[in-house]
Amino acid sequence: MSEFNEKPEKLIVDGLRLDGRKFDELRPIKIEASVLKRADGSCYLEMGKNKVIAAVFGPREVHPRHLQDPSKAIIRYRYNMAPFSVEERKRPGPDRRSIEISKVSKEAFEAVIMKELFPRSAIDIFVEVLQADAGSRTACLNAASVALVDAGVPMKGMITSVAVGKADGQLVLDPMKEEDNFGEADMPFAFLIRNGKIESIALLQMDGRMTRDEVKQAIELAKKGALQIYEMQREAILRRYIEVGEEMDEITEGGEDA
């Protein structure tokens, strides 16, 4: 069960949040690429208490054929929460929230994947929430982005996602569950980042209320967090490439010794 079952008296005490973070700090993040052998690309990611896994298949032929687009690949994205991912057991299958998250996430990736290189094909992205906490959609977007790179899918850059919330009147980066449940606002972002620079906003949603100035501040706070996450995504991919290189060296050395 959650440590906080009822609304806490305060969400920020002496400048610190309930989990000890400052307003501009991310939750702990762990990223591991290429965790599923049968997928073309995959990623396991932890973001706070969120635990998610993403798998990419394709580009591959579309069935049935009448769904094919002769000019470009179609992108299919499925966000799903495992029945055991939340404290109260969830019914299997997609609900309205999962369908909505799948739709906006697909649109974010459609803007960055070079679809025109793969006409009449499909790129399928499956993300499964194994353990849910605040910000599961942002965690899944980050995992899916790494999985796409792992699959070798050409993109204009990385999709990197983080949310900004408002708790006790203070903007906070990467809200925890209590801030998400009892705060005044929640604003998930996804950015297109290329070569360490933010190119554009690929996704922006809003739940709650912020002033115009707060929205501007939230965008800057989200950019700061996204660039940190981008470096973690990049490091996870580089680690995987190094592992592949070492495996190839071992195979080559073994062949020479034979």
UniProtKB/Swiss-Prot annotation:
Component of the archaeal exosome complex. Forms a hexameric ring-like arrangement composed of 3 Rrp41-Rrp42 heterodimers. The hexameric ring associates with a trimer of Rrp4 and/or Csl4 subunits. One of its GO terms (biological process) is rRNA catabolic process. It is an enzyme of class 3 (hydrolase). Changing R65E: Reduces RNA degradation more than 90%. Abolishes RNA binding by the Rrp41-Rrp42 ring. This is Exosome complex component Rrp41. Keywords: Cytoplasm, Exonuclease, Exosome, Hydrolase, Nuclease. Its EC number is 3.1.13.-. It comes from Archaeoglobus fulgidus (strain ATCC 49558 / DSM 4304 / JCM 9628 / NBRC 100126 / VC-16). HAMAP family: Exosome_Rrp41 (MF_00591). Catalytic component of the exosome, which is a complex involved in RNA degradation. Has 3'->5' exoribonuclease activity. Can also synthesize heteromeric RNA-tails. Its main location: cytoplasm. GO terms for cellular component: cytoplasmic exosome (RNase complex). InterPro entries: ExoRNase_PH_dom1 (IPR001247), ExoRNase_PH_dom2 (IPR015847), ExoRNase_PH_dom2_sf (IPR036345), PNPase/RNase_PH_dom_sf (IPR027408), Ribosomal_Su5_D2-typ_SF (IPR020568), RNase_PH (IPR050080), Rrp41 (IPR011807). Pfam families: RNase_PH, RNase_PH_C. Belongs to the RNase PH family. Rrp41 subfamily. GO terms for molecular function: 3'-5'-RNA exonuclease activity; RNA binding. It is found in: Cytoplasm. The lineage of its organism: Archaea, Methanobacteriati, Methanobacteriota, Archaeoglobi, Archaeoglobales.
